[in-house]
């Protein structure tokens, strides 16, 4: 089924962390247990914020794959918030993967790569 919304706000729980997703369009596939968000996607949680063109949520394992030209992202690496961009982002409960034209700024230094893997810390203490 395909539903078209001007703005869709949904809250879920990812590894005991709440998040909110906003987009113009949503497609829910109950057979595959997936939700696809398209157009002006905004993902917000305590540790990760990004804007993308598309986002696919797999509800079985609570993993995400986002696409954009580029995706703008801000995330907490356990020490500080880091800003950057990439064309593809994959998130599961423990790992943030950025790929295709990755560029981040950490501690004032710009880092460029084709692929980057960041282990997420669920503990801010």
Regions found by a protein language model. Give the residues of each.
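N-terminal amphipathic/hydrophobic interface segments
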Residues: 16-125
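N-terminal signal peptide c-region/cleavage motif recognized by signal peptidases
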Residues: 11-12
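Sec-dependent signal peptide recognition
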Residues: 1-8
């Amino acid at each position: 089924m395909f539903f078209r919304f001007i703005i869709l706000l949904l809250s879920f729980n990812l590894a005991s962390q709440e998040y909110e997703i906003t987009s113009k369009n949503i497609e829910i596939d109950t057979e595959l247990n997936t939700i696809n968000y398209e157009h002006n996607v905004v993902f917000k949680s305590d540790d990760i914020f990004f804007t993308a063109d598309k986002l696919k949520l797999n509800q079985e394992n609570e993993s995400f794959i986002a696409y954009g030209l580029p995706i703008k992202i801000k995330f907490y690496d356990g020490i500080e918030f880091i800003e950057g961009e990439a064309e593809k982002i994959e998130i599961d409960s423990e790992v943030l993967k950025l790929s295709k034209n990755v560029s981040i700024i950490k501690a004032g230094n710009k880092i460029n790569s084709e692929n980057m893997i960041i282990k997420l810390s669920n503990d801010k203490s």
